[in-house]
Amino acid sequence: MKHTLPSALVTLWRDSPGYESARSRTFNQRVPPELPYAIVKPKNVEQIQQAVQLAIDLDKQIRIRSGGHSLAGWTLCADSILIDLVDFMHLEYDATTAIASASPSATSAQLNDLLVPHGRFVPVGHCGDVGLGGFFLQGGMGLNCRSYGWACEYLVGVDLITADGEYKHCSESENADLFWAARGAGPEFPAIVTRFFIRTRPAAAKHEKSTFIWPVACSDAVVSWILKILPELHADIEPLVVSTIVPGPNIAAILVQFLVFLGTNETGAEKLEPSLTAMPDGTIMEFKGVSTSIQQEYVSQEGTMPRDSRYICDSVWFKDGIDFVAVTRRMFREFPRDRSMVYWEPKYPTSRRKLPDMAFSLQADQYLALFAIFEDSQQDQEQGIRIQEFIQEIEPYVLGTFAADGVPAVRKTQYWSAEVIERLYSVCQKWDPAHRLGCTLLDPTRKMKS
């Protein structure tokens, strides 16, 4: 049964023109089959409240879409009210406080572009089109996270609509339990964010990138080298390691990229060169000291991970202290084929810091993700099985998974510390007792009984 709504509120029912294109507004072209009961596209806070009331009146669950970048397609839930924030946009910077404010639909690239003229920076996502809603709520594995910390640590306040339609502001001193949850609860956050308030930091004056590529047979030497230099690697350098098929020579290779954040009179060489003295021999390509910018990196990333592809991803936090070289050897050497890749982003030393009191609570020295990237829908099952075969092989060495990469329907794992899980159940029960929001990573039956 359809429901009478204000005419200004864009609402698409299953038989409405444009329903399917709105439903499939996702980065991943492997769109889940679930059909929302209705898709609502609010333009202001009042309309978000109207959408919540619609869900209450019809006794439906609610899903929120910010940028649509979730590779697992969490925003699509059968028979739910999907609130798509694509037309709800706010982006502003206050130079007197150095605080930015943004709606969940604003992207990493848009926030970065806003701050660049002011010489300010937030460790935004590695993909420019990632919406800030999912990014901040899941913790925010942003640029140079290993040194600059988790993006959610930069939040100083959040405006939101509760599950019963009330407007609230939360911070460390106001509705503190919701503010705690907003920093790491991910898709289990029991409210709808309308605005993030974000502390900024001085931006780098310039950036340089150095890239080194070896045949994949050199993976042991390359991985050992990265592990060795991490404790002394300059804090303004982000290292990334990727194992993939390199176009051109069309061979399986292991690639190391260093993104260097520089002051006006600094050079990449003075920050990076000390770490290159023990670099393994045998590179097939080297690109040193290439001038770049965050904007340019986003353009490059669009080529590596384009919107017109199908994606399957799973990731792990490895237990600290394992023989990382031996455990990951087969992944680095055998997983790459076609456009698929192994992605390793070391988190030391931020992984050793005591985290603030927030829901984000699971981290380790080493984060690694497997990406299958392809076009043919007939490969969906094969690609998914292949990823899980590699993941199952390393399961004894796994601490848990980054919430943004969770695939609970495929693999059960840990996304938060045990004590945070207990606390998160309590916060969800307090603010969403009817369980309208969330149902992805926590047990929905237990949430309702907490």
From Swiss-Prot:
The UniProt entry, under InterPro entries, shows: FAD-bd_PCMH, FAD-bd_PCMH-like_sf, FAD-bd_PCMH_sub1, FAD-bd_PCMH_sub2, FAD-linked_Oxidoreductase, Oxid_FAD_bind_N
Q: Which residues form the FAD-binding PCMH-type domain?
A: 32-203
Known EC number(s)?
A: 1.1.1.-
Taxonomy, superkingdom = Eukaryota
What general EC class does the enzyme of this chain belong to? Answer: oxidoreductase
MF terms from GO for this chain are: FAD binding; oxidoreductase activity
Per the UniProt record, which residue ranges are transmembrane? none
**Keywords in alphabetical order:** FAD, Flavoprotein, Oxidoreductase
Family per record: Belongs to the oxygen-dependent FAD-linked oxidoreductase family.
Q: What does this protein do?
A: FAD-linked oxidoreductase; part of the gene cluster that mediates the biosynthesis of the indole diterpenes penitrems. The geranylgeranyl diphosphate (GGPP) synthase penG catalyzes the first step in penitrem biosynthesis via conversion of farnesyl pyrophosphate and isopentyl pyrophosphate into geranylgeranyl pyrophosphate (GGPP). Condensation of indole-3-glycerol phosphate with GGPP by the prenyl transferase penC then forms 3-geranylgeranylindole (3-GGI).
* Protein name from the UniProt record: FAD-linked oxidoreductase penO
